[in-house]
């Protein structure tokens, strides 16, 4: 008996000394949403994956400005996440990382389901690796965005104008807001608001997306379909001069807050929500989606929820840009948001499993729609969902995308991700408004940098 007891005690001590088998972990870096519903949609998908696989997802969320530095730091330290998604990866790093051989080829995930996606979404994820000397799917597409204009209908009314008074032509449109609406509203309200929240910060993706839209208004093409630069064409230079002139003119006329030269991505939203600006151009409808989220937020008072609902239904308009200076309708560039798996990730097998799970229509669509219209789907089926016809804001987004979009330069020449990361566009804008450099000189500097980087 003593021997049995001693054996049992020894076995117990051995068991106590042996650590429990650790739960398998997947490390994920993911961009933080702009409001609660967006993050809740992500967490719901993560929880579903955890329940299915019994794998713990260790998720770290970062703002657009933090996401790339945090990911680069992890890469440099030799501990990259197993999966990473950032709202500006497509603009600034995915093409460069693929070229440098830092990304895992995930064609085995994308190829079997690529018929579900629209072509532009696939083009953004189909990247060239200088290591393999070929293109492959080195990223996974999740959702997309394009440029919209949003304005306060009630503030426009307080200034004494109706929506039908808004011009449809380019020059007249901006003049209307700056020279008519702004002074009229200031006089009527006694408050020093600004007509336009105009992003110009170098540390902002909004600023270069907005500027490139002004560039598109002048039909400027910086690269051909093979990625060859076209900036030596005198027409391209003149178009850039016109775009920079128009973009900086809004600032020099005192039509946007002085602080907008330093704005980061959320700041034009904040100015709009605070009603210190009447209009802003934004590359998603996150502005109205924030009020949709507030209208359903149980932590707010009923009065606050009712006001949020009224803002969505009555007070905020979602619209497209005016016609281009040549009189033709604006053609919008779409940016497809992508995530990646790194070649040096420690748990690539589970990382691929997570990506495959997220790419499944029944998981991807609720995640995208959970952002309440901030992002538009990249799958054909989800684009035809009744969700996009539920209100006038989402319908406006739906109609813009269905009218056709064009891709960014970086889908043809990956080195434009470097130029976007530097934000040569906002640097030129700030040279003009802060350093009083002539527009043509700022454009010459911009062109020289484009040729140096992407030539």
Question: What is each PLM-predicted segment?
Answer:
Residues 23-24, 47, 52, 77, ...:
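Extracytoplasmic/periplasmic substrate-recognition and gating elements
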Residues 24-27, 44-124, 157-160, 165-168, ...:
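Extracytoplasmic "Venus flytrap"/periplasmic binding protein-like
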Residues 26-43, 145, 205, 413-417:
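Extracytoplasmic "Venus flytrap"
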Residues 89-148, 207, 219, 305-321, ...:
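Hinge/lid segment of periplasmic solute-binding proteins
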Residues 105-120, 166, 185-186, 194-202, ...:
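Short, solvent-exposed loop/beta-turn-alpha elements that line the ligand-binding surface or hinge
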Residues 129-142, 147, 174-230:
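Extracytoplasmic/periplasmic solute-binding protein
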Residues 132, 332-333, 374-377, 395-454:
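C-terminal capping/gating helix-and-loop segments adjacent to ligand/active sites or protein-protein/ligand interfaces
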Residues 174-180, 225-261, 317, 321:
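Glycine-centered hinge/linker elements that transmit conformational signals in sensory
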